């Protein structure tokens, strides 16, 4: 009885390739004894040299990919914003790069070589990051709830102000670079509805509000080191405390806090300003003393 012979139609090159693959797999697994015993010294040295060259080439390729991804993480604004909070995967960086290029293509090519637009983009990202840090500080360090009036009004005001600045920068894209200190005084500030005075306590303040931003802009450009404080309409305490007229009534930590936030043209009426010289007023308010000067000044 004849046995069925296998089909030898395949070429000898395929068989040699299979043997070579088995040898390479043996090299990768570290079992070199069985693979090298059947080869001549010249063939084994060639295999080892090829494997060594392949490892060097692979390492260089990985280094180029990692360097390119690091540059993309630094250049793409959305990836640069998230790099401090969480570790980005390679696929996420590539996706953010594609989205950024699509956005630039949709904008008609504007921003490719516009250094001012890129600086404004990074500035808005920095402002948003500082806003998130303020919210985290008030909730974690100070222990304020998410429904606390101080936290809600401050965060909503800063968020509204950031939106206004982004809209203003988009409308006036043809202007030159405007520094932070003088940029806040050029555009009238529209107060957030939560920051408006209630029950007629701020009638005098609302009457002077149309001309107030212009005066604040002039004062900010002429005296950038002076904090922009508004005079209170009355001396009594209401639901919203009036702003202290002179900086001498503030405690030293709050003085440094106001000096560091002098560029922001929002009213400090939502903060309970406590002074060591008035212990009775501090006792009546029932609010804990919060020395924010050193923390905010550090930023």
From Swiss-Prot:
Residues spanning the signal sequence: none
UniProt motif YRPW motif: location: 289-292
InterPro entries in alphabetical order: bHLH_dom, HES_HEY, HLH_DNA-bd_sf, Orange_dom
Pfam families listed in its UniProt record: Hairy_orange, HLH
Single GO MF annotation: DNA-binding transcription factor activity
Region (Transcriptional repression and interaction with NCOR1 and SIN3A): 48-117
Bias type Polar residues, positions: 28-47
Region (Disordered): 1-53, 194-234
Domain Orange stretches: 122-158
Chief location category: nucleus
Function: Transcriptional repressor which binds preferentially to the canonical E box sequence 5'-CACGTG-3'. Downstream effector of Notch signaling required for cardiovascular development. Specifically required for the Notch-induced endocardial epithelial to mesenchymal transition, which is itself criticial for cardiac valve and septum development. May be required in conjunction with HEY2 to specify arterial cell fate or identity. Promotes maintenance of neuronal precursor cells and glial versus neuronal fate specification.
Assembly notes: May self-associate. Interacts with HES1, NCOR1 and SIN3A. Interacts with GATA4, GATA6 and HDAC1 and HEYL. Interacts with CCDC89/BOIP.
Family statement drawn from the similarity comment of this UniProt entry: Belongs to the HEY family.
PANTHER family hit by this protein: BASIC HELIX-LOOP-HELIX TRANSCRIPTION FACTOR, HES-RELATED
Protein's name in the database: Hairy/enhancer-of-split related with YRPW motif protein 1
Organism: Mus musculus
């Amino acid at each position: 009885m004849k046995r069925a012979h296998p089909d030898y139609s395949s070429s000898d090159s395929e068989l040699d390739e299979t043997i070579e693959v088995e040898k390479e797999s043996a090299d990768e697994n570290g079992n070199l004894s069985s693979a090298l015993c059947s080869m001549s010294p010249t063939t084994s040295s060639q295999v080892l040299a090829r494997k060594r060259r392949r490892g060097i080439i692979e390492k260089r390729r990985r280094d180029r990919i990692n360097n390119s991804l690091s540059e993309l993480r630094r250049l793409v604004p959305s990836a640069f914003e998230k790099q401090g909070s969480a570790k980005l995967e390679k696929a996420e960086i590539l996706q953010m790069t594609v989205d950024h290029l699509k956005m630039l293509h949709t904008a008609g090519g504007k921003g490719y070589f516009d250094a001012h637009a890129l600086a404004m983009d990074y500035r808005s990202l920095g402002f948003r990051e500082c806003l998130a840090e303020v919210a985290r500080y008030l909730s974690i360090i100070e222990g304020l709830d998410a429904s606390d009036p101080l936290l809600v009004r401050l965060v909503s005001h800063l968020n509204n102000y950031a939106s206004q600045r982004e809209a203003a920068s988009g409308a006036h894209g043809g202007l030159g670079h405007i520094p932070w200190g003088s940029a806040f005084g050029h555009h009238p500030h529209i107060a957030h509805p939560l920051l408006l005075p209630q029950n007629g306590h701020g009638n005098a303040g609302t009457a002077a509000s149309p001309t107030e931003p212009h005066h604040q802009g002039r004062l900010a450009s002429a005296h950038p080191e002076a904090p922009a404080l508004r005079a209170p309409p009355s001396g009594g305490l209401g639901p919203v405390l009036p702003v202290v007229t002179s900086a001498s009534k503030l405690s030293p930590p709050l003085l440094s806090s106001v000096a560091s936030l002098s560029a922001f043209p929002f009213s400090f009426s939502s903060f309970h300003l406590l002074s060591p010289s008035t212990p009775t007023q501090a006792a009546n308010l029932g609010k804990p003393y919060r020395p924010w000067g050193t923390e905010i000044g550090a930023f």
